[in-house]
Structure formats: structure tokens, C-alpha cells
């Protein structure tokens, strides 16, 4: 695959995730957009690793670490959202003032 096509696709994914993260009012949607941003970054790691240094797997291994950290982040984030929903009955970002009290 051509490098420019993959980079354009990754940039689209990154900016869709960034737009969703900025405009989202739901916590679950914000977590999904954050995961989309991390996947776009992972796509760049794998692409540059394959394009520039095909003999070593540095980008691929770094991508595996990022996926593991993103999975832990998603689990912790969903646990926090679940706890906030149990207490407040809402997952809207602008309605959660749990830390202010």
C-alpha cells in the first residue's frame, strides 16, 4: 500500500476522533473517540515501521504496548462511567459534577 494513502486514512481517523472528543457530551462516546485517536496513532506506528525499517519490529512492538495500555484505559474509564451512572443516573459530561462536591 502507498504510504500517503495510509497516512491520509490515519489522519482522517485521528481528526474524526478529535472532533468527536471535543464535541461529545456523552462519556462513553468520548471514550470511544479517544480509542479511535489511539488506533490512528497505532496505524502510523505500524506504517512507518513497515515502510522505513522492515527488518526490525520496533513499531509493531510499540503498537502492542499502546493497545495494552488502551485496553486498560478503556476498562478503567468504563468502570468510572459505570460508577458515575449508578450515582447520578446520567453519563452526560456537563451534568457530572461529582468531583466538585
From Swiss-Prot:
Keyword field: Chloroplast, Membrane, NAD, NADP, Plastid, Plastoquinone, Quinone, Thylakoid, Translocase, Transmembrane, Transmembrane helix, Transport
Pfam families, A to Z: Oxidored_q2 (PF00420)
EC number of the protein: 7.1.1.-
GO terms for biological process, alphabetical: ATP synthesis coupled electron transport; photosynthesis, light reaction
Keyword Transferase: no
InterPro entries reported in the protein's UniProt record: NADH_UbQ_OxRdtase_chain4L/K (IPR001133), NUOK/Mnh_C1-like (IPR039428)
Principal subcellular localisation of the protein: plastid
GO cellular component: chloroplast thylakoid membrane; NADH dehydrogenase complex
Disulfide bonding pattern of the chain: none
Top-level taxon: Eukaryota
Transmembrane segments annotated in the record for this chain: 2-22, 32-52, 61-81
Topology relative to the membrane: Multi-pass membrane protein
Catalytic activities: a plastoquinone + NADH + (n+1) H(+)(in) = a plastoquinol + NAD(+) + n H(+)(out); a plastoquinone + NADPH + (n+1) H(+)(in) = a plastoquinol + NADP(+) + n H(+)(out)
Signal peptide: none
Enzyme class, spelled out: translocase
GO molecular function, one term: quinone binding
Subcellular location: Plastid, Chloroplast thylakoid membrane
Quaternary state and interactors: NDH is composed of at least 16 different subunits, 5 of which are encoded in the nucleus.
Family listed: Belongs to the complex I subunit 4L family.
HAMAP family given in the database record: NDH1_NuoK
Function: NDH shuttles electrons from NAD(P)H:plastoquinone, via FMN and iron-sulfur (Fe-S) centers, to quinones in the photosynthetic chain and possibly in a chloroplast respiratory chain. The immediate electron acceptor for the enzyme in this species is believed to be plastoquinone. Couples the redox reaction to proton translocation, and thus conserves the redox energy in a proton gradient.
Protein name: NAD(P)H-quinone oxidoreductase subunit 4L, chloroplastic
Protein source organism: Aethionema cordifolium
